[in-house]
């Protein structure tokens, strides 16, 4: 400042924000991509629900208001709550260790949902976990298709070759799987049925019957 109280010169400090802005935009894009592709839900270290995205809410049939502030245990079968395994699960996350796999969860109304998911502890600047984020994909259709295929194989092994999977309720890859299994069984069963017919005819001495 000059003697008259007016400024004589200005000091300017310029910060290069280019790299910071690039990093911010990259992170923003990553978060948006995850939000569009995965069901996500956030918990504190006690398992209390903090937030959830639209895909998770749609998958589980809840609104955010119905979930926020509630405990993770509302999303699991009642038989699992209070078990040693369930306590160990949250203790593990509290230590900052992630957990991944296929999880059976209960949606609104008791509907069974299967998730391919990972529970990821988030660390603060000191390396201490302070929350857990679940990233998940709904694989309920695949699991149901797997169950139906296993039932069909068991029936075929027992000689029930007329059994087929009702494919109308499946979509996408699950629909393709169940339809292909049905076609495979058709291909196997048809000549077997024909052979059974011929053998039955032979047993009756009807030698005019033959396999085409």
Show which residues each predicted segment covers:
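PAS/PAC sensory module
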Residues: 1, 11, 99-104, 109-117, ...
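PAS-family sensory domains
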Residues: 6-16, 128-138
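Polar/charged heptad-repeat coiled-coil helices used as signal-transmission/dimerization stalks
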Residues: 19-36, 58, 65, 87-91, ...
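PAS and PAS-like sensory modules
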Residues: 39, 85, 99-104, 211
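Conserved hydrophobic beta-strand signature of PAS-family and PAS-like sensory domains
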Residues: 40, 47-50, 174
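PAS/LOV sensory domain surfaces, especially short acidic/polar patches at coil-to-helix junctions
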Residues: 46, 50-58, 70
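PAS-family sensory/regulatory domains
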Residues: 66-80
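Output-coupling edge of small sensory domains
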Residues: 120-122
């Amino acid at each position: 400042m000059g003697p008259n109280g007016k400024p004589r010169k200005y000091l300017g400090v310029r910060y290069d924000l280019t790299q910071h802005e690039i990093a911010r935009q990259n992170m923003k894009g990553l978060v948006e991509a995850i939000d569009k592709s995965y069901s996500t839900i956030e918990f504190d270290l006690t398992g209390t629900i903090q937030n959830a995205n639209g895909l998770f809410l749609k998958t589980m049939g809840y609104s955010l208001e119905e979930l926020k502030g509630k405990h993770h245990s509302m999303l699991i079968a009642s038989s699992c709550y209070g078990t040693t395994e369930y306590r160990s699960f949250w203790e593990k996350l509290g230590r900052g260790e992630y957990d991944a796999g296929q999880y059976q969860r209960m949606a609104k109304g008791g509907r069974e949902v299967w998730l391919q998911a990972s529970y990821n502890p988030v660390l603060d600047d000191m390396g201490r976990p302070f929350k857990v984020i679940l990233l998940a994909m709904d694989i309920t259709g695949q699991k149901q298709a797997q169950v139906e295929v296993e039932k069909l194989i068991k029936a075929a092994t027992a000689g029930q070759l007329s059994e087929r999977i009702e494919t109308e309720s499946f979509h996408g890859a699950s629909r393709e799987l169940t339809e292909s299994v049905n076609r495979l069984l058709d291909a196997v069963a048809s000549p077997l049925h024909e052979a059974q017919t011929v053998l039955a005819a032979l047993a009756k001495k009807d030698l005019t019957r033959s396999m085409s």
